[in-house]
């Protein structure tokens, strides 16, 4: 009974929810064998043809390359690309690639030499003697990636499976309309394909190997059954035709009844899936020693006069392939890379063929039908019924259109396989897949930005923590240094303490005066002088405080100073224009100048020490001060311009000038030390000073007249 149940379960086929049955349109291209396409003159090889980062360049402009020669190095998840033919590297520059927006990616441009020479090839026909790691590394370095459309590096996928893979599934469903690349490959290369499957099984050591193929490929089914006639380790499962049965999650459920968990991978349930084209590429890499330089591409559509499947070299321009298939474009011709449901329209035809290019569809106007205008959603739920991932496309549409990223994520938009079934059945002609692609791209960009922000925050916090640790370490070092001084510092501290103790001991000793000697009062005298100096400093401080309290009007002072300067300039000009016969006694002039300066200083000090209520006009004071200075300069100039016959003893003149300056200083000090109650009226003082200057001037003129 258990054996019967196991046999029943072994051949059981499950069915997934949703799905559609569009017109297959496969007979246009699957009836002719695979053929080679003549070499193009120029090849454009993008460095990134897979999921992951691009490899490191190992060629330069001007290098000669052979077919199969690595153009980049593959390290980690970086998959290398290889030269599709022999020729010369003419440029390494960005070039538009197979993308809906024709985004430019760094590419190696090779001009073919027409010889198509291979590099030396080293095949491993005895691959069973090689270790698992060696085989995975060879597959990776030979550039093998998933050829079913995802482009995930095969070596990385095999390495990630490890020892937990129980079921190896070979995806031969090829469910999308028009595409027949896998169908034709299975018809023409079934034996090589099975050999590649055995290499994968040798690496993974699964418990069972399943080939899932739709029942609309009878010739391919017959070829595989013929090759597997003597094999018991590989099971061929024929499944009903339904779109999208070729989806990874859908085919896994159809063949095993297991569902891949949300956000997980098929390896989490012990399943690993590979495409038939990938298995064939593994065989050529391991046994033949040939890196992946070409793949099968379907050329179909009513605008192509010679449809079929061809071996297309990677990097071949799409235009070259279409011209070889006798492309007859119409006025508004559209060319789709991929199928009609999951493919995208090419913006121009000079983009190159890459590893994930499986079909070039050039439909006519009759095939496409009239373009339908997008209308409002009528909430019919037809999209939800057709969704094979059990999602709610209607809700995802509203969330995507309203930029509600959180709600779209909550409704598992990441599980959308972009099969296009919802858009196919939508009566309002809403391009739902386009909305979902854009929403997923925006969510990915937001997460990438959040990741960068989190990394920046982590770096900032790490830096702050490091600075705090360094600061704490410095403080700890300073504390340690303060607590434990060095030997040199200890000696200095001990010497200072000894000196202090010695001084204290001397201070406590009694003063002894010997007979016949005078006591040493130098310390007492020095202390008394210090106290006097301190008292004088305090008195000066107090005087400065009192002076600051009595502030004159600064505007009046400035005006008086300006008037004084003007009068002084006038006197200097008069002195310069005076007649030579008016000679002045230089000694008397010097004495008078000193007296005038002393009076001027006395007047300024009296003005500064005046009470606040007795304000002096600063303009008058400044004018008088300037007049006094001008008279002093005039007398000094007269002394300098004296006639030679009236020579003056310089020593006497210097003595007299010094006496005059001393008297002036004495007068200033007396004014400064005057009692506060003996205040002088600044106006009276200014008048007296002016009278004194006038009398001095008159006396000087009278003396000159008498001498004449």
Swiss-Prot record:
One of its GO terms (biological process) is electron transport chain. InterPro entries: 4Fe4S_Fe-S-bd, 4Fe4S_Fe_S_CS, Ion_transpt_RnfC/RsxC, Nuo51_FMN-bd, Nuo51_FMN-bd_sf, RnfC_N, Soluble_ligand-bd. Its EC number is 7.-.-.-. Gene3D superfamilies: 3.30.70.20, NADH-ubiquinone oxidoreductase 51kDa subunit (3.40.50.11540). Residues 369-397, 407-436 form the 4Fe-4S ferredoxin-type domain. Its cofactor is [4Fe-4S] cluster. It comes from the Bacteria. Its main location: membrane. Belongs to the 4Fe4S bacterial-type ferredoxin family. RnfC subfamily. Part of a membrane-bound complex that couples electron transfer with translocation of ions across the membrane. Required to maintain the reduced state of SoxR. This is Ion-translocating oxidoreductase complex subunit C. It comes from Shigella boydii serotype 18 (strain CDC 3083-94 / BS512). The gene is rsxC.
């Amino acid at each position: 009974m258990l054996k019967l149940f196991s046999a029943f379960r072994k051949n059981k086929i499950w069915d997934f929810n949703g799905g559609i049955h569009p017109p297959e349109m496969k007979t246009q291209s699957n009836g002719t064998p695979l053929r080679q396409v003549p070499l193009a003159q120029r090849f454009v090889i993008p460095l990134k043809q897979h999921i992951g980062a691009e490899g490191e360049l190992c060629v330069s402009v001007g290098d000669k390359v052979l077919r199969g020669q690595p153009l980049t190095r593959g390290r980690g998840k970086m998959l290398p690309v290889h030269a599709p033919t022999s020729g010369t590297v003419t440029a390494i520059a960005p070039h538009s690639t197979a993308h809906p927006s024709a985004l430019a990616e760094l590419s190696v441009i090779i001009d073919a030499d027409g010889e198509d020479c291979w590099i030396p090839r080293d095949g491993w026909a005895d691959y069973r003697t090689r270790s698992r790691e060696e085989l995975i590394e060879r597959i990776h370095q030979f550039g093998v990636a998933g050829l079913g459309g995802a482009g995930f590096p095969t070596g990385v996928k095999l390495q990630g499976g490890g020892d937990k893979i129980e079921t190896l599934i070979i995806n031969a469903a090829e469910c999308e309309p028009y595409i027949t690349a896998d169908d034709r490959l299975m018809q023409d290369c079934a034996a090589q394909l099975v050999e590649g499957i055995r290499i994968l099984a040798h690496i993974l050591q699964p418990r069972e190997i399943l080939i899932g193929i739709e029942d609309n490929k009878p010739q391919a089914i017959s070829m595989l059954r013929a090759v597997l006639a003597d094999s018991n380790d590989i099971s061929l499962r024929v499944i009903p035709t339904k779109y999208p049965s070729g989806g990874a999650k859908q085919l896994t459920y159809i063949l095993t009844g297991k569902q891949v968990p949300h956000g997980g991978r098929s390896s989490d349930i012990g399943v690993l899936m590979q495409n038939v084209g990938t298995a064939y590429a593994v065989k050529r890499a391991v046994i033949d020693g040939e890196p992946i330089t070409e793949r099968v591409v379907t050329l179909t559509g009513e605008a192509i006069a010679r449809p079929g499947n061809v071996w297309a070299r990677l990097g071949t321009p799409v235009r070259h392939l279409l011209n070889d298939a006798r492309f007859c474009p119409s006025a508004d011709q559209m060319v789709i890379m991929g199928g009609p449901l999951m493919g995208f329209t090419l913006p121009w035809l000079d983009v190159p063929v890459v590893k994930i290019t499986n079909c070039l569809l050039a439909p006519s106007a009759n095939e496409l039908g009239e373009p339908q205008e997008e209308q409002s959603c009528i909430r019919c739920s037809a999209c939800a019924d057709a969704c094979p991932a059990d999602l709610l496309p209607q809700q995802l549409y509203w969330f995507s259109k309203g930029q509600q990223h959180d709600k779209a994520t909550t409704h598992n938009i990441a599980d959308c396989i972009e099969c296009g079934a919802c858009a196919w059945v939508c009566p309002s002609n809403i391009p739902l897949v386009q909305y979902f692609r854009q929403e997923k791209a925006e969510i990915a960009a937001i997460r990438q930005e959040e990741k960068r922000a989190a990394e920046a925050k982590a770096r900032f916090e790490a830096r702050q923590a490091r600075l705090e640790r360094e600061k704490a370490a410095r403080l700890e070092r300073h504390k340690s240094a303060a607590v434990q001084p060095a030997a040199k510092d200890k000696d200095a501290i001990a010497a200072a303490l000894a000196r202090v103790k010695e001084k204290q001991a001397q201070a406590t000793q009694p003063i002894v005066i010997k007979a016949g000697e005078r006591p040493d009062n130098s310390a007492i005298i020095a202390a008394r002088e210090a106290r006097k100096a301190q008292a004088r400093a305090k008195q000066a401080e107090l005087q400065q405080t009192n002076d600051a309290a009595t502030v004159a009007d600064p505007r009046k002072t400035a005006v008086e100073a300006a008037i004084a300067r003007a009068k002084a300039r006038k006197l200097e000009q008069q002195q310069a224009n005076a007649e030579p016969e008016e000679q002045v006694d230089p000694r008397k002039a010097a004495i008078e100048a000193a007296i005038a300066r002393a009076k001027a200083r006395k007047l300024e000090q009296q003005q500064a020490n005046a009470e606040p209520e007795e304000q002096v006009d600063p303009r008058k004071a400044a004018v008088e001060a300037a007049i006094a200075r001008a008279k002093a300069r005039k007398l000094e100039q007269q002394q300098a311009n004296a006639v030679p016959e009236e020579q003056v003893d310089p020593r006497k003149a210097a003595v007299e000038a010094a006496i005059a300056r001393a008297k002036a200083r004495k007068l200033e000090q007396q004014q400064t030390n005057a009692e506060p109650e003996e205040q002088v009226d600044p106006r009276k003082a200014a008048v007296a000073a002016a009278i004194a200057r006038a009398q001095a001037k008159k006396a000087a003129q009278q003396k000159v007249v008498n001498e004449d």
